[in-house]
From Swiss-Prot:
Signal peptide: none
An MF annotation (GO) of this entry: DNA-binding transcription factor activity, RNA polymerase II-specific
Gene, per the UniProt record: prtT
DNA-binding region(s), chain positions: 47-76
Chief localization: nucleus
Protein name per Swiss-Prot or TrEMBL: Transcriptional activator of proteases prtT
UniProt-annotated stretches for the region Disordered: 127-153
Ranges of biased composition (kind: Polar residues): 127-145
One cellular component term from this protein's GO annotations in UniProt: nucleus
Amino acid sequence: MTRTGPPINPISWDTKTIVPDDGSRIDSVACQDARPKGRIRRSMTACHTCRKLKTRCDVDPRGHSCRRCLSLRLDCELPETTERFQDNASTWSDATAVPSIEERLVSLERGMGEMIHLMRQIVKSSPSMPCSPTFQTRNHSIDGTSSSDSMSSSFYPLKPAQLIRDLQAECFGERAHFSDADILGDIVTQGIVDSKLSVKLIELFVEHFGHWVSINHSSSLQRSNTLLFNTACLLASRYMPGLPQHTVRDISLYVQHAVAKVLWKPPPMTSDMLQALTLLCLYSTSIHKEGLMDDWLLSGISINHALISFNFLNTLPGDNLSPDELLAQLRLWNTLCATQLHSALANGRTVNIQQQYINQCPRILEHAGATPEDGRIVAEIQLYRIALRLQHSQSRLQFAESEYEELERWRMEWAHLLTTNGDSTLNLNLWFCQLLLHRTAARLQPDSERLLPEICGTARLIITQFLQTRFTSAPALIDHVYFIVGYAALTLCDYTLTDPLINQVRGFLLHLAPGGDNLSYRIACIVGEVQRRYSEATAVVAAGSHSSSPVAEVKGAQMFGSSHHHRTGMELSQLMSSPEGLDSLVEGYNCLEQMMPGYAASQPAFEAPDLFHHSPTTGVTGGAMPIGLVPRALHDW
């Protein structure tokens, strides 16, 4: 029997609406041109599970599983159709990027893990953490925590000793801090100099030394900051030849006594005191004739005070410090680090700064107010770190060549600061490090003569560039520069005693000295004394033998034994063998009046020995005291 009713259209997936991932409903009628036309048997499109169960298999042909298998969590085995095959082909083409994506995810996870590990190490090793402005007021607790140490509320180490000291001061009424008046008054109040002279001294200090501690105006120096004020006057007094020696001596003793008390003050230390200590580290030898300060010890203790006092070491950039305060602290910190590294290498000692704090030095280069001088200090710090590592590597020095790879990389990195300008001392420091490494290697290598050309050549480079120093730049040169030049001259005395550069640099140092107590004068005397002793010993050796190199035999003799007693007065006429030392000096080095033009001499100045007179009637003086700076005791204003 044949059915005559209207045909029943089977319901299949092409008449159903599909809910896409974005939640909107799409009518299948609008997409029929993209669907296969005609009737498709359900068994051809159903999965293996639905065919076995003889149930409807509701699946999107672009999907990979039907709804039943998804709900039952079964593996859906769909038959391959032409459309699905084409779709799978495009899917597999896209799947080729999956491994690279997975590799990137694994790399990102590994990087995040390393960052988390480093952050944990920083938190554990850092003495302090960032502090918010709300913790700037002093707030004590039973654990002894306070905002003065720049601690974060999330990490406070226990400080029982600090707690006991604070409670002791509270219970017994003891003062925890000394004022400047408790330590020492200023030299004007003490009557050592009068106010007019102190004004001139401060002006001279600002002009030649203030840049080291970010002091650009005399108004920045107040008498209330006694240690800084006295130190500034002491530095300037070195270049006033007419100033009585007892006055300079009294200022020096006052500063030394104040430093001895300041160093034992409870931290934190004020900014002006750290500025004074930094200046004393730079000029520890030249400003004190009575009782020299050890720059290595002084810089080490000052660095410990700075670690507690400087906020930028304990906080992240952009904290409560103003840009000018941050720049001043960064500049002081870098200068202290440089003096510590200078003294460690020059004295054969260790460095008392942790690596993480030295790594803070380049931060100053990111500041908008950084100067080329700041960059030079950072370059010196990196240079001396390299030299110290090489100096303590015996294996490297035993087989050392004329060049070191680390120093060459440093030279390439800082080539823009290495100039032949006489005012720049960066080249002097590089050659000094090379000279020290070459001489150390020569002691360890059996064939020491192999490095002799490098040693003498480097010493000549140092002296040659130093002879180009302008007279107006000489006062600002730190003690370490004079040590470099003196060591280069002594090196030439060791190997080439007749080198004319020895006499030239000796005369040049004497010409720079405004007085007999100046460091350049003393180094010139030392070089002259060593040259004299070598000359005498060489003459004795040459008379007793016919050696081709008398100086080489003299080096093995006892040149500086106990038989040579200290002489309080040293006559330069005995030290200088000929006046040719001044013949090749750079023109323009006549007297100290060039530093302060417009002043006339009113006192007898320091005079060089007769040996340095270019003619019997013309003398070369070391300077003159400006009439406006003569103390009352010497001149009636």
